[in-house]
Amino acid sequence: MDVLELLRASANGCYNTIFSDAWSQYVSQQITSSLYLYIALGILTVLFVAWFIYFKRLARLRLRDEIARSLNAVTSASGGDLRGLRFRKRDKMLFYGRRMLRKMKNVSGQMYSSGKGYKRRAVMRFARRILQLRRENMPLEMRTVEPPAEYLEETIEGSDRVPPDALYMLQSIRIFGHFEKPVFLKLCKHTQVLELMAGDYLFKITDADDSVYIVQSGMINVYISNADGSTLSLKTVRKGESVTSLLSFIDVLSGNPSYYKTVTAKAMEKSVVIRLPMQAFEEVFRENPDVMIRVIQVIMIRLQRVLFTALRNYLGLNAELVQNHMRNKSITISGHLNSQSQSSQSMRQQTTATATGGTSATALGGQQLPAAVPSLPLQRQPPPPTIAPPLRHSREEHTLSGPNPNPNSGNNVQLPEVHGDAPNIDIYHQQQHGGSTSTGNLSTRRGSLVQPSIGGGGGGSTAQEGGCAAAGAPTIDMRLIQSSAVESLRKELGLPNEDAHIIEPFVEVRELEPNVTLITEGNADDVCIWFVMTGTLAVYQGVADATRSSTATTKSDKSDLLIHFVHPGEIVGGLAMLTGEASAYTIRSRNNSRVAYIRRAAIYQIMRQRPRIVLDLGNGVVRRLSPLVRQCDYALDWIFLESGRAVYRQDESSDSTYIVLSGRMRSVITNPGGKKEIVGEYGKGDLVGIVEMITETSRTTTVMAVRDSELAKLPEGLFNAIKLRYPIVVTKLISFLSHRFLGSMQTRGSTGAPGAPVEANPVTHKYSTVALVPITDEVPLTPFTYELYHSLCAIGPVLRLTSEVVRKQLGQNIFEAANEYRLTSWLAQQEDRNIITLYQCDNSLSPWTHRCMRQADVILIVGLGDRSHLVGKFEREIDRLAMRTQKELVLLYPETTNAKPANTLSWLNARPWVTKHHHVLCVKRIFTRKSQYRINDLYSRVLLSEPNMHSDFSRLARWLTGNSIGLVLGGGGARGAAHIGMLKAIQEAGIPIDMVGGVSIGALMGALWCSERNITTVTQKARQWSKKMTKWFLQLLDLTYPITSMFSGREFNKTIHDTFGDVSIEDLWIPYFTLTTDITASCHRIHTNGSLWRYVRSSMSLSGYMPPLCDPKDGHLLLDGGYVNNLPGHLWRYCRASMSIAGVFPPFCDYRDGHLLLDGCYTNNVPADVMHNLGAAHIIAIDVGSQDDTDLTNYGDDLSGWWLLYKKWNPFTSPVKVPDLPDIQSRLAYVSCVRQLEEVKNSDYCEYIRPPIDKYKTLAFGSFDEIRDVGYVFGKNYFESMAKAGRLGRFNQWFNKEPPKRGNHASLNEYTFIDLAQIVCKLPETYAVNTAEIFSEDEDCDGYISEPSTLNTDRRIQVPRAGNSLSLSEAEMDSDVEIDFRSDSKKDKATQSTPPAPGKDNEDKTDAVDRIPLLTLERPLTDQQQQHSDETDEQETPRAMKDGTNTMTTQTTSPTTDAGSEWAGSESELEKENKNVNTKN
């Protein structure tokens, strides 16, 4: 920094008199010739030293002369003889004693004072003794504790209790769902062990595709054969992996087994493979139909999630996944003859009526159909119709092996057009003025379908697709249309003729005009089975993008992509019907069409009577898929990982990539020294390991599951095959990787710097599931959850779940191990439909609390900030249960008290597992003690109001969803007063501030805002501090000898300390950081904790003016952070460190490590990149630094200083612009800062703002009000222009301006998980009589037995292998010995905490109940009850809870009670249960 500029600014800012101008001019002239000043100082120093030496020598000579005179006097007095003189004995003893003691003291000092650091301590003691320094009391330091080993290491557990072959089979068949032990043992009986040599075929083309193959040892290569005879590898199957196809599984179960057409598997080395025939499942399904239905549903769900997610969202394949049209399909539409109402002749006339514009059946087929024919088959092509059963749908040539007619096809696939002359299968039509009477079964039910009904009295006016109906066309009886639709749907559902009466009451017919939307993508209310009778339906899908939010529900029609057409005789809607999820497509009518449909509730009622129709529906979905999907089905794998399990490890070969379907993954790198660091975290929808796979390099990190997670594995072979077939995939991936690398380049600046916190790593701060845990029973957890839920509703759909809500939706016994699949599936669907799900834990270690820990991406530990910080037993158990899950501390403060956060370090030091903390100011209603019912009633009204976007709850909500808004304040001396005006303008613009970072003067202003959050108070304190900086006499008293800096920094420290006091960064309301330049380690440092005033002072230590601040942590010297990054404990210390201007103020010594800190402007004067790394999604960066003059004079190859002096002093010559020595040094110091600033300006996450304050100098603190007004006016105009241009929405685009409507804050009843097995097989809800006993048993167990990956077999039943089967022998399969499938650790834990075994009577009763078949557990319904159940299913009327949240209608026969009474009843029952548990314990 130029000294001349500073002194001029000081003079101009404080004095306007003639004397001050003359004084400043005189000083300027003197400093200009600084070389002469230094020479003069040197001469004076030499003269002073010479005089000092001369004086000391003169004094020594005088002393010697005096001694000589004294000796001469003694000699003369004794006559010149000194032999008679001697010392006295006591003088001798005293002399020798002192001498001995002096030697002993030196020896002891060497013994006890030597060692490491002795010299340094001795020098410090000597300096204190000389300079009389006082060691001030150091503040409380934050204890730095390394995370536990489990946080960064994977879980490596053996499976000694399970034979390897049985374990591999368990892991392979779990893709079909969860199987109980008896079912698994029955499947084991059908296994076969195959031994293959290298080169042997496991299966090849034309072999039956009817088995599941599990590799026990060795390696199998799965490849496809092309038409030219070449092969292309899909994947390599290694030990423990399997080869299976979900689509082939459905084919086998439906009685239509297929064969391998293009896929072949060959052993690459000697291998042992376990073969499980798919026919083995049929035996199990016959005995347990609910298992069959559940397996079909699981297959459909995973088909939709794994295949469609991988191929559609990431590879850009849409229309290629389904067949564009069905060829060689013969459709039969039956028209039942009604002899009671019409004669045979009239029926024959009606059957020959035209379906399109008067075309007769004779014209279509070339012959007259006999009247005795009960069905009229028609084909799409003009050849004559034949009476034949429906043929299977042929597949469109979308394969990996066939030639691609359009290699650039991707999203723009040309589908065959179906024009008006397309044949229709419904040969009946209505006359425009017909008068047929419809039956009672044809009553039109109006849902969300907005299309005209079939006229009054059964007739209607409908335009057919071939043209307008002729006026004289015959009239069709609606009963014949209805019977035709019933017969067609009966055959599509695979029902025999005698079961037509089952579906007849539920079949509805609609006449559609062109462009009528039947159902939209993402809609779950209007899911139906649609059968096209005439016309054509078009199926669309939104343009998929890997970065697109799953919660987006509104999009224009232009973004929809045409997938395929549904022609007459085809059915659509089976996938959504079987999965129970929302529709994945948008279906519209392409022209005038007639469709028959059955609603979802009706289909489920039909399934109850005929469960086998799920196979026909599933087979219909499979037939529609292209061969490409089947080939991908062999290669794509579904993987379930428990918490701690590794996806892949560092230095392993990379042969696949993974897609996170649910859960959370953590990437950890192991450095050469063995230390492990977090590289990043991945959430739902992220792509893991894609870079290593494409570049064919080994894995650079280890990726493990933070919680239970589901992944889709995409092998490299499949990726290459799709790449060759569809080049559009390359474009899709290039776009995806470009965005990823661009983001990593923009955030690379401060990553990995010394002193950077863990949050500086590129960890995604966007969570899908959040668990809320109270520290004590005094914490108002329910009101806190409601307030957070209220703020989250402004961002997107959110769900709040408690144990009471889950039991109310899914039954009281939902937390039992038998209901594991139903609970996990329901929770997974809720997480998919909402951007975030809140899991409110119980106040004890209940099964629900265990479930919350397993489901959570992050755990919020909620406590009261004004209470004790001690850790409770319950909180320690939470850390033990979820060691890898990130935990954040939330401290609540009542709004009525004006107290600020304090003692936060004590909270954090007591909880080393906490990675972040939040201070939340709560309104009065949160701490009001009320009953659960009154709390629910209160927040049912609060949730209808608009949330306060500036509250701490909204700030916490934005942090959890990855929408935080950061404010970065740059350095610039007195020009930083513009920050105050900009803060006021930001507040008036309605932009919330969630995080603040600053450098130099920006560190001071940002710390004031985080501490006060009131613009008036911040302005007053900033003005007072600026006024102190204008007192020149205090600055003169602070002058010192300019070895390190011009000022000692004592008075400057006092001004910052008086502003903040002894406040720590952890005690600020808003997350804050400051940046300094560490001259000890030659890097920048980010301070997010510690002494506030010290690090602000360090960030303001400009070189040459203030000495660097010595970091008390490690002793490093810190300078102004602007030298490396001009935009980014006790608070004042780090503020002081951030203001340590080199040369003016001395570097500030960090009290933690002793590093010297200087102003952060030397490294980064606008640290917006640091803010982005800390989790801010949108950033406002305000730059008030000085700008260097780039218009310099070209003086040639050499430069004479005398010529510059002549140009400067000669008023008659033109001035030249050449930098002097201080200016050159300043430009060199700011080189990295300028580069960092340009990157910030070009980033897409930052809004760079620079107020017009260039005319103000760095030390013009006297112009505080003027500079502040300039910043305010500029900021107000800037944000108004942004609002007019529509760019202000990037800072509040997530915020819902409209208040939420009633019932919108919970969506449990709008859409919920549908368990087909429970619906079809009528499995009743079993409510326990004594719920306290259930709670006591559940609380003792450690979680669930959720997945087979942790299942271990008891050693008691392990016997040697018998025959070509699994290691489980026949005796084991038939024995009644209970197999414990838990892991070793969990079993030992459960063994220690298992309660005593129940009595003999209870055990016998339990066994008796288990032996009853599932289908006989339900009491038969009476006719009246059945009618009431049917009406309930058809209407699907939701019930609203009293607290404003919706609940799901359960499949029970109990009458519906009042919502308020339900809440009150559940609360009283919960209190009784807790009392019983406490009593029993």
Curated annotation (Swiss-Prot):
Residues 1-34 are lumenal. Its main location: endoplasmic reticulum. It is found in: Endoplasmic reticulum membrane. InterPro entries: Acyl_Trfase/lysoPLipase (IPR016035), cNMP-bd_dom (IPR000595), cNMP-bd_dom_sf (IPR018490), LysoPLipase_patatin_CS (IPR001423), NTE (IPR050301), NTE1_P-loop_dom (IPR056556), PNPLA_dom (IPR002641), RmlC-like_jellyroll (IPR014710). The modification Phosphoserine is found at S448, S1214. Residues 339-379, 401-412, 1445-1457 have a biased composition (Low complexity). It catalyses: a 1-acyl-sn-glycero-3-phosphocholine + H2O = sn-glycerol 3-phosphocholine + a fatty acid + H(+). It is a single-pass type I membrane protein. A motif (GXGXXG) lies at residues 971-976. Signal peptide: none annotated. GO terms for molecular function: lysophospholipase activity. It is an enzyme of class 3 (hydrolase). Its EC number is 3.1.1.5. A nucleoside 3',5'-cyclic phosphate 3 binds at residues 613-740. A motif (GXSXG) lies at residues 998-1002. GO terms for biological process: glial cell apoptotic process; lipid catabolic process; membrane lipid metabolic process; membrane organization; nervous system development; neuron apoptotic process; phosphatidylcholine metabolic process. Residues 967-1133 form the PNPLA domain. The keyword Amino-acid biosynthesis does not apply. It comes from the Eukaryota. A motif (DGA/G) lies at residues 1120-1122. Keywords: Developmental protein, Endoplasmic reticulum, Hydrolase, Lipid degradation, Lipid metabolism, Membrane, Neurogenesis, Phosphoprotein, Transmembrane, Transmembrane helix. Interacts with Pka-C3; interaction inhibits the catalytic function of Pka-C3 and the esterase activity of sws. Belongs to the NTE family. This is Neuropathy target esterase sws. The gene is sws.
